[in-house]
């Protein structure tokens, strides 16, 4: 059975067990939670993660003493969102005195601002470690990054993450570090006698002790980071999606992985939702009656063309609503009992600039019924 078929089956099964009792359909509880230190915002590419994370940060700035919006997405759309250039250093966002933003690269690089203080001996160990634990280079860089972030004195940090696959790797780094560093610590114990003998023949005793100290420090750091990740009072994840198959599928995959890693997740933001209009249908019979009353042929043709175009637009609108309703129903059935599901409307233009972000952020506080087409 394919992954798509599996998801379809799970959706059908969940639908039969759906209870009408639901969580609030806004982010008020998230924003009012004073214990949270880290809020991760993630999902499939192109679903509005940056807009959502920026909006959450703007609302938090009204409630918390100091807020940092941190982009770990290589695309770094936060600068475009606020029309302001950000770097790998916290920069105050225009018009705020307590909201900062920074854009960092979580991939391993000699040029990264958060790199390990390496030695020649450490350089010799790393290649062996890389072969045994692929991805440990990025994990080490991530550990240094998270430790630096942890030492920053912000009330809360909002992470604008990369698309799902990259984010899942990022969240797996603490466990990878724990395994790799545990391997090194065990190796040290096994080779303790040999290493002590080597000390008497070399001048590297201080260097060896420095490396062991660094490894123990990194191990303690990875345990601390993992503990923070798994503490629902300190860390939570906000999933962002749109009502389309691939996005809903990736959201399910993301939530399953977060559950496996014991990371709290109880909010889903569904963007680009087409809500019902006040009047959804064109009264064709009435329009045809009006058409017969028009004597001027040119006006009659123009009116007829207008009615036809309106009808075509209505057909597209209804088709779009029906398609979205299929996935909104699945989202409701899968997550309605355990998540705050916030539906955000399809807007006329992209969200750029502080005013537009602020307007969007206010909508996150509004309770809106999930618009299922009947």
From Swiss-Prot:
One GO cellular component term noted in the UniProt record for this chain: GET complex
GO terms of molecular function: ATP binding; ATP hydrolysis activity
Subcellular location(s) per record: Cytoplasm; Endoplasmic reticulum
InterPro entries: Anion-transp_ATPase-like_dom, ATPase_ArsA/GET3, ATPase_ArsA/GET3_euk, P-loop_NTPase
Active-site feature positions: 73
Superkingdom of this protein's organism: Eukaryota
UniProt similarity note: Belongs to the arsA ATPase family.
Protein name: ATPase ASNA1 homolog
Native organism taxonomy: Eukaryota, Sar, Alveolata, Apicomplexa, Aconoidasida
